[in-house]
Amino acid sequence: VYKRQQYVEVPQVEGVPLVADMSSMILSKPVNVSKYGCIYFGVQKNVAPAGMAIAIVRDDLLGHAADTVPTMMNYTTLLAKDSMYNTPPCWCIYMTGLVLKYLENDIGGLENMQKINEAKAKILYDYLDGQEFFRNPVEHRYRSTMNVTFTSPDPDMDKKFCAEAAEAGFVNLKGHRLVGGMRASIYNAMPTEGVEKLVDFMEKFRKANA
């Protein structure tokens, strides 16, 4: 996911390892890790409480760090020490384990998680496409299932929407600083009911301000 768009095709260049920051979409659907040289993600969005990052690195890319790379950022060192070169973030590791067990045992795997996420996102996108007050600027095939962006008729209305939404219990809807508008983050932990209530609020706001 980049700002408000989600990559559909994975670019492949022969001889060039692909490195991806998957913080916004990891564990939201299956990923073919063999297509990547390195996958990096912070756990704070879809995995566990903030405080840890995870890297999946292809074996042939290890052992080539320059001498200027700090020890704490050298994946070869971290791997050799079983990720415990320094004191590990125990709480984050524990919570990550619980989430992984939940995804496997309760959800039934990432294929099912993907279906749930696509269904959640569809509720919000269908609403956005069915009226003209709020707009989503992203081409359909590049729409993110994790971060749904939208705008109202003007920036002042965006501010009013965010303020009234916060009063109604919908927090952190202000969009990315580079693109403005609003951004609804509907990660794995967001239940379908949360998306439905947001849509209900958006419709009430639209009727009151259109």
Spans of features found by a protein language model:
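Catalytic PLP-binding core of fold-type I/II PLP enzymes
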Residues: 5-34
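Short, small-residue-biased leader/transition segments that mark boundaries at the very start
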Residues: 1-2
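Active-site C-terminal subdomain of aminotransferase-like
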Residues: 43-125, 139, 208-210
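PLP-dependent enzyme catalytic core of the Aspartate aminotransferase-like
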Residues: 167, 176-210
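A short alpha/beta connector and helix-capping loop motif
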Residues: 30-45
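A short linear hydrophobic-aromatic micro-motif
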Residues: 133-137, 169-175
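General beta-strand structural signal in soluble alpha/beta enzymes
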Residues: 18-22, 40-42, 172-175
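Conserved PLP-binding catalytic core of the aspartate aminotransferase-like
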Residues: 134-165
